[in-house]
């Protein structure tokens, strides 16, 4: 392998002399074309408490390049006396609707203050577009509908940031996290909180939304999701999350995000000091690399079939899964993945919205051996620096269920870097796929500008180191309150 190539980039948003700053990028391709929607926060200063509103630029693919339109302020994506933060869009292929989720935070209340006091100031909101981002409807406050009374036990919460996903069953998923209040003193003063990733979901094309169970064990925060076909190991919803533990955390769901199995640390994905948001995107492995094993099934008597609308997910059976204690659990393509035969099974907890509901999850055959290469691969973007947010890197996993499978990074930008979002935007001329990355960058700080670049799967394979090399995680775990 020669000297790694650095993709050319386009600066889409740049800090202004007045102090106006653009942060927290989110990228969504909308077919046909696709049209690219680049969302960011517009802030009065780089500080979280000075977030102001959400803005958008639309891009169209033309002749192998992207032509970008002017900046558009999303005036309806707001609640009175609140600041709009954390853009997280998801596209419903069935209706063509884009749902832009965000949180609306009262006044200038910082997240750290909410965590310290145990008093949530955030609302769950979304706006919708049916014309690929040209126009947007009014804001919906979904807090009561999606979270309900459980929000009383949350010090704060947020969505994404980044992008949501849709499964072939039709389920829409929006990644999220909360700081759950684990203990209070008798006079109402907060005693202890813990961060947990989870997902909001809709099974009716976005008409109604519900809250899935929390990742139950390790501290996990800002996260993204991908559907993963693990070959012999089955199909899962994969969650990759920021953590104060010195490395990223991953968790799997067998029921489309209704609940998550216990998480594990990913030593091959080190965090920067205090952590940083990162992005993942799943995609079908190149055809010669797709293993097949007919000894696995999706439901009784049904062989594992190639993906229909995306890798790793299949149409759900009609009947509900049965709890061995006599109840039923929500259906979905992930909830019935079982090996044929009577292999050993280990039951695991399925926390509800508050993490302590007496419910369950279908267990995986444990331990399982992830194949050397799986039918779904993952890309991951995150700053490479350990002490500071420096050098945007791209890593590849050809076996996502194995936390040791990540490559060393291909650095696509040298310099201060921060939050990012990845997307698969179409086929490459030489075969394979083209990906896009929207990321924070700058000459002096990571919030000087928001840059956009594209690269192909072939370029990833040519530029990432050939084999993963787990880093030394000598850093002590950090506290559970992080700067964004």
UniProtKB/Swiss-Prot annotation:
SUPFAM superfamilies: Sialidases (SSF50939)
Low complexity biased stretches: 336-345
Enzyme Commission (EC) number: 3.2.1.18
Annotated effect of mutating residue 5 to A: Impairs mitochondrial targeting
An individual GO BP term: negative regulation of neuron projection development
Keyword Hydrolase: yes
Record-linked Pfam families: BNR_2 (PF13088)
Keyword Repeat tagged: yes
Keywords: Carbohydrate metabolism, Cell membrane, Cell projection, Endoplasmic reticulum, Glycosidase, Hydrolase, Lipid degradation, Lipid metabolism, Lysosome, Membrane, Microsome, Mitochondrion, Mitochondrion inner membrane, Mitochondrion outer membrane, Repeat
Residue sites binding substrate per the record: 23, 43, 177, 179, 222, 242, 389
Record-linked InterPro entries: Sialidase (IPR011040), Sialidase_fam (IPR026856), Sialidase_sf (IPR036278)
GO cellular component: cytoplasm; endoplasmic reticulum membrane; lysosomal lumen; lysosome; membrane; mitochondrial inner membrane; mitochondrial outer membrane; neuron projection
Region spans: Disordered: 284-357
Coiled coil stretches, renumbered: none
Induction (UniProt): Down-regulated during monocyte to macrophage differentiation.
Domain of life of the organism encoding this protein: Eukaryota
PANTHER family in the cross-refs: SIALIDASE (PTHR10628), SIALIDASE-4 (PTHR10628:SF22)
Name by which UniProt lists this protein: Sialidase-4
């Amino acid at each position: 392998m020669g000297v790694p190539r650095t993709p050319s980039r386009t600066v889409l948003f740049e800090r202004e002399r007045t102090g106006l700053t653009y942060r927290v990028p989110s990228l969504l391709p909308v077919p046909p074309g696709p049209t690219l929607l680049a969302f960011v926060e517009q802030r009065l200063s780089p500080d979280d408490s000075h977030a102001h509103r959400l803005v958008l630029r639309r891009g169209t693919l033309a002749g192998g390049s992207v032509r970008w339109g002017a900046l558009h302020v999303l005036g309806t994506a707001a609640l009175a006396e609140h600041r709009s933060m954390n853009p997280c869009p998801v596209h419903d292929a069935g209706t063509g609707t884009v749902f832009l989720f965000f949180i609306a935070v009262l006044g200038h209340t910082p997240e750290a203050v909410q965590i310290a006091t145990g008093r949530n100031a955030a609302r769950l909101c979304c706006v919708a577009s049916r014309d690929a981002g040209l126009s947007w409807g009014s804001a919906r406050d979904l807090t009561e509908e999606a979270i309900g009374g459980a929000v009383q036990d949350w010090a704060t919460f947020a969505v994404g940031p980044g992008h949501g996903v849709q499964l072939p069953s039709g389920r829409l998923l929006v990644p999220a996290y909360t700081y759950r209040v684990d203990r209070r003193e008798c006079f109402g003063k907060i005693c202890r909180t813990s961060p947990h990733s989870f997902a909001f979901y809709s099974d009716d094309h976005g008409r109604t939304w519900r809250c899935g169970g929390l990742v139950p064990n390790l501290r996990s925060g800002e996260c993204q999701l991908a559907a993963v076909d693990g070959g012999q190991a089955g199909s899962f919803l994969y969650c990759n999350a920021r953590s104060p533990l010195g490395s990223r955390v991953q968790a799997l769901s067998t029921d489309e995000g209704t609940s998550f199995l216990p998480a594990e640390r990913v030593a091959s994905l080190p965090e920067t000091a205090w952590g940083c948001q990162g992005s993942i995107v799943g995609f079908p492995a190149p055809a010669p690399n797709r293993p097949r094993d007919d000894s696995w099934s999706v439901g009784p008597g049904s062989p594992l079939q190639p993906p229909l609308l995306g890798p790793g997910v299949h149409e759900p059976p009609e009947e509900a899964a049965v709890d061995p204690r006599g109840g039923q659990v929500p259906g979905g393509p992930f909830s019935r993945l079982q090996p044929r035969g009577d292999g050993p099974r280990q039951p695991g907890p399925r926390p509800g919205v508050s993490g302590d509901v007496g419910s369950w999850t279908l267990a995986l055959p444990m331990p399982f051996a992830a194949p050397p290469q799986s039918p779904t691969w993952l890309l991951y973007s995150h700053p490479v620096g350990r002490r500071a947010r420096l050098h945007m890197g791209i890593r590849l996993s050809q076996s996502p269920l194995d936390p040791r499978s990540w490559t060393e990074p291909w650095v696509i930008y040298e310099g201060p870097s921060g939050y990012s979002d990845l997307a698969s935007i179409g086929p490459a001329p030489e075969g394979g796929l083209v990906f896009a990355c929207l990321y924070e960058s700058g000459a002096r700080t990571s919030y000087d500008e928001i840059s956009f670049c594209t690269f192909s799967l072939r370029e990833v394979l040519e530029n990432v180191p050939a084999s993963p090399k787990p880093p030394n995680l000598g850093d002590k775990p950090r506290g559970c309150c992080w700067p964004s």
